[in-house]
Regions:
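Short Cys/His-rich "knuckle" micro-motifs
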Residues: 159
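Sec/Tat signal peptide C-region and signal peptidase I cleavage site
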Residues: 30-37
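Aromatic (phenylalanine/tyrosine) cluster motif
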Residues: 3, 11-12
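Bacterial N-terminal signal peptides that target proteins for export
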Residues: 12-24
């Protein structure tokens, strides 16, 4: 028995750096997995950021808030940032759970969903390039927001 203990101890001592590396790597992997949110939570966070970005735009359109080019730029940047990863947040298997409002049509009409996202991406980029003042804002933003609403009509289920 003593021989086995000595052999095991020598093995661990001689390979302690390897064992530490494996242990640290495993701990990092587990921590990363634990911190990673679900696709449903991730896409809900993106949609929440879109909602926050839309509020000042809608308020400016209604005359409830003075026009601010800085606020417009911030909102459009939020749209662009969220849209860049949005379509990746709908993997198969994330159709149900966690109070999702995602319509099954997202998966049955994946090409249409991706096309709607591409259209939004294009409209956001065009708005970023063209909005320079209140007049160009009022000429551009209503169509962009209408596109958001159309996507919600097609690809969102409200309880």
């Amino acid at each position: 028995m003593h021989f086995v203990e000595c052999t095991v101890n020598r093995f661990y001592e001689s390979n302690s750096m390897i064992h530490r590396s494996v242990l640290v790597g495993s701990a990092l992997l587990l921590a990363t997995a634990a911190l990673a949110a679900s696709p449903i939570a991730d896409r809900q966070a993106v949609m929440k950021s879109f909602g926050g970005a839309t509020k000042p735009l809608a308020a400016m359109l209604k005359g409830e808030k003075p026009f601010s080019l800085d606020d417009v730029k911030k909102s459009l940047a939020t749209y662009a940032e969220g849209n860049a990863k949005f379509v990746t947040l709908f993997p198969k298997g994330s159709e149900k759970g966690e109070n999702t409002e995602a319509s099954p049509k997202i998966w049955s009409d994946a090409a249409g969903f991706k096309a709607a996202n591409e259209k939004f991406k294009t409209e956001v980029a065009a708005a970023q390039a063209s909005i320079k003042d209140e007049a160009s804002f009022k000429a551009t933003i209503p169509a962009l927001l209408k596109n958001c609403g159309a996507c919600h009509e097609s690809y969102r289920v409200k309880d």
